[in-house]
Amino acid sequence: MTDASQRPVLLLLEDESQLKAALCDTLGDEFEIETATSAEEALLLLGTRKFDVLLCDQMLPGKRQGLDFLGEAMLQQPQARRILVTGYLNPELLARSTSLVQLSACLVKPVEIEQLRQTIRDALAHPAPGQS
């Protein structure tokens, strides 16, 4: 965010169109949202602007999964807070994601919208992990 009057910019990486639309409708009043349906598409968007938050599902179509995308995104935009959403809590996945991509948060589906909104707000209140 460059100006306090601007809404934080969020990149939503979600392949389920109905869920993506619902999240955009619900979160769009507080955040400026760009969307992608694959890691490849999201990586292209990273080259077009700076994002404050990267919110991404773990299970995605194509060769790259959510953690793969977040790892690459961390190199391109280290200032962006990284939030992973997964349908299952796997301790190995959580440990890998915490150490490799320095997550701001990891949420397990189903996620209540207010929990998601508060998680994004909490992430924005602090620098991205690894940033001062």
What are these regions (language model features)?
Residues 1-11, 17, 40, 75, ...:
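Non-catalytic signal-transmission and effector/linker regions of two-component phosphorelay proteins
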Residues 16-34, 101:
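Two-component/phosphorelay signaling modules centered on CheY-like receiver
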Residues 35-53, 58-61:
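Acidic, metal-coordinating helix/loop segments flanking the phosphotransfer/catalytic sites
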Residues 44, 67-79:
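Short amphipathic alpha-helix used as the core "switch/output" element in two-component signaling
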Residues 67-68, 89-106:
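Alpha4 helix (beta4-alpha4-beta5 surface) of REC/receiver domains from two-component response regulators
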Residues 85-86:
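Hydrophobic/aromatic residues positioned on beta-strands within the core alpha/beta folds
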Residues 109:
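A Lys-centered signature of the CheY-like receiver
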